[in-house]
Amino acid sequence: MPLIIDADVIIRGERGLFDLPAWLEKQADKGPQIAAITLAELWHGVERATRTFKARREAYLQMVVETLPVVPYTETTALEHARLWAALEGSGRMIGFYDLIVAATALESGSAVATFNSRHFSQVRGLKVIVPK
């Protein structure tokens, strides 16, 4: 099953709290990717970084972009996103907006989500969630 990597996994790697390159190497057979919204979240972090950290964050993100293909947000993803949003909102189990888009991207592409935020993603029916180790 393909694997969509959540921003928190990449951020922990950038902060030295998780060995992202080693873990990604072990996941190579799953075709790890990132959702387009995740790329936006990560670039936002680069843009907000202080001058001291900006170059390092940008270099790390470049490594991520060169390593992980980006799954686009398509019209089909938008429909999955809307359905998921309505279902979670209606059940009172709403999750963060960006997490919702990552989940919709994963469901639409038949992928699992790798995240340290399993509490949110486990609210999504039918979504396989993997906590990296």
Question: Where do the protein language model's features map onto the residues?
Answer:
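Short, structured coil segments at secondary-structure junctions
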Residues: 28, 66, 124-125
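Acidic, PIN/NYN-like endoribonuclease modules and their adjacent C-terminal/linker elements
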Residues: 1, 103, 107-133
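Active-site neighborhoods of divalent-metal-dependent phosphate/nucleic-acid chemistry enzymes
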Residues: 44-47, 69-116
